[in-house]
Amino acid sequence: MYIKVLGIVLSVFLSTSVNSEVTKEKFILSPSILEIEGDIAYGEYLASDCQTCHRADNSNEGIPGINGREIIEIVYALHEYKNKYRENQVMQMMAGGLGDEEIAALASYFASLQ
């Protein structure tokens, strides 16, 4: 699992555009956070708040669908909102109250949905 996650992180890092005029420092998560195995059942329990805005059918009416996305993508997004690296007040507030285990659980749950 760790090798797969590391490979995904590397590919995301290498595919990041270096030609943009305005660049932020790369957001880095520690390996200990990336190694957390998310509990899908716990993620399902927590997901009701997310599903208020993120539609189950992944339709995008200004709010992206998250079902079926890669675990690493969801983990990074939630940590970026939590740390105010990404801008969106609602997502910053929602992610701000989540712990590492809760983020891993939500990521595992939403990644399991197709």
Task: Report each predicted region and the residues it spans.
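Bacterial N-terminal signal peptides
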Residues: 7-13
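N-terminal signal peptide c-region/cleavage motif recognized by signal peptidases
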Residues: 15-17
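C-terminal capping alpha-helices of c-type cytochrome domains
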Residues: 21, 25, 77, 96-114
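Electrostatic cytochrome c docking/interface patches
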Residues: 21-46
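Gly/Gly-Pro-rich "capping" loops immediately C-terminal to redox-active cysteine motifs
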Residues: 40, 44, 58-86
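The canonical Cys-X-X-Cys-His
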Residues: 43, 48-57, 106, 110
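Electron-transfer interface patches adjacent to heme c in soluble/periplasmic c-type cytochromes
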Residues: 64-69, 93-103
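Short Fe-S-cluster ligation motifs
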Residues: 79-100
